[in-house]
Amino acid sequence: MSCYDLCRPSAPTPLANSCNEPCVRQCQDSRVVIQPSPVVVTLPGPILSSFPQNTAVGSSTSAAVGSILSEEGVPISSGGFGISGLGSRFSSRRCLPY
């Protein structure tokens, strides 16, 4: 018997076709699945740390003090703290027109 059926009297059907008794019926439970809304969780990114170290490599001879050293550690100029040797160091890497 469906939940929506009319209440039927237990006695013979009266001529007025009325229902004199209260009709209370409990229907089956309804099940509703409520999905949770999407949740955005932000996880912190990794922490990258480095420990840079400055290292000076050169000659321990007194002639190299105050001089600009080449990649091999040989003094380029002996002019003390001047920058006269700086141009010759970088000019060797330039492409010159022929």
From Swiss-Prot:
The keyword Cell membrane does not apply. InterPro entries: Keratin (IPR003461). It comes from the Eukaryota. Keywords: Acetylation, Keratin. One of its GO terms (cellular component) is intermediate filament. One of its GO terms (molecular function) is structural constituent of cytoskeleton. The modification N-acetylserine is found at residue 2. The keyword Acetylation applies. Pfam families: Keratin. Signal peptide: none annotated. The avian keratins (F-ker, S-ker, C-ker and B-ker) are a complex mixture of very similar polypeptides. Belongs to the avian keratin family. PANTHER family: BETA-KERATIN-RELATED PROTEIN-RELATED. This is Feather keratin 4. It comes from Gallus gallus (Chicken). The lineage of its organism: Eukaryota, Metazoa, Chordata, Craniata, Vertebrata.
